[in-house]
UniProtKB/Swiss-Prot annotation:
Keywords noted in UniProt: Magnesium, Metal-binding, Transferase
Identification of the protein by name: Isoprenyl transferase 1
InterPro entries: UPP_synth-like, UPP_synth-like_CS, UPP_synth-like_sf
Record keyword Repeat present: no
C-alpha cells in the first residue's frame, strides 16, 4: 500500500505536492524489482482507490497520467512482468483505461513476476461484484431462490473475485504510518501478515523492504488455528 506521497512532498518543502506522486511512481518499478530479487512471484500495488476518485479533478488528472505511465513502464519487454488490472476501469477516463488495458494485453504471455495494479479499486465493492456475478450466473442457469442462496459459499465467492486464480497475499506492507487496510483486499487478506512503517512511500528503501521480509519470515502463521 503505497501511501504518503503528498505528505512526503509537503515535509520535503515542495509547494507542489504532485512531486510526491511522481517520485512515488518511480519507486513502484524499483519495488517490483526488489520483489523479483527475493523470489516473490506476485505483488499487488494499490494505486487508486474508489474513494480517491473523490479528489479534485486537477489532482486526479495528474494521478491518471502517472498511473498510466507506471503501466507503460511495467509493460516494457525487459521487465518480463505480467500486469493484471484489478478494479473498476469504467470509472477512469477512456484514454487512461485504454493505456492500462494495452499494458495488460502486452504482458499476458510474459513469464516473470505477476503485478496486480489496483486502480479504481474498493475491497467492499470487489466482494459485492463477486456475489452479484455468482448470483447472476446461477439465475441464468435457472436456479431457484433457495438454490441461489445455497450457492453463496466461501469458495464460490473466491472464484469470482478480481484476483480469481491467484493465492491470497502472505504479507501486506503499508507505508506512511497509517495502520489500517483502507479497503485493500478485504476478502483475500483475512490471514495475511501486516507490516506497517512510518516511512512515506517516496522514501521507502530496499532496506525497508528487506526488513519487512525479514520480520515476516520470523512470524509464526497460524491461520486462526
Amino acid at each position: 500500500m503505497c501511501d504518503g506521497n503528498r505528505r512526503w512532498a509537503r515535509e520535503a518543502g515542495f509547494t507542489d505536492v504532485s512531486h510526491g506522486h511522481r517520485v512515488g511512481a518511480k519507486k513502484i518499478g524499483e519495488m517490483v524489482r526488489w520483489c523479483d530479487d527475493v523470489d516473490v512471484n506476485l505483488v499487488t500495488v494499490y494505486l487508486l482507490s474508489m474513494e480517491n476518485l473523490g479528489r479534485s479533478s486537477e489532482e486526479l488528472q495528474l494521478l491518471f497520467d502517472i498511473i498510466a505511465d507506471v503501466a507503460d513502464e511495467l509493460a516494457r519487454p525487459e521487465t518480463n512482468c505480467r500486469v493484471r488490472l484489478v478494479g473498476h476501469l469504467d470509472l477512469l477516463p477512456d484514454p487512461v483505461a485504454c493505456r492500462l488495458r494495452k499494458a495488460e494485453e502486452a504482458t499476458v504471455n510474459n513469464t516473470g513476476i505477476a503485478v496486480n495494479m489496483a486502480v479504481g479499486y474498493g475491497g467492499r465493492q470487489e466482494i459485492v461484484d463477486a456475489v452479484q456475478k455468482l448470483l447472476t450466473i446461477g439465475k441464468d442457469e435457472g436456479l431457484s431462490v433457495d438454490e441461489l442462496i445455497e450457492s453463496v459459499k466461501v469458495d464460490a465467492i473466491s472464484t469470482h473475485l478480481y484476483t480469481s486464480g491467484q493465492p491470497d497475499p502472505d504479507l501486506v506492507i503499508r507505508t506512511s504510518g497509517e495502520q489500517r487496510l483502507s479497503g485493500f483486499m478485504l476478502w483475500q487478506s483475512a490471514y495475511s501478515e501486516i507490516w506497517f512503517t512510518d516511512t512515506y512511500w517516496p522514501a521507502f528503501r530496499r532496506i525497508d523492504f528487506l526488513r519487512a521480509i525479514r520480520d515476516y519470515s520470523q512470524r509464526s502463521r497460524r491461520f486462526g488455528k
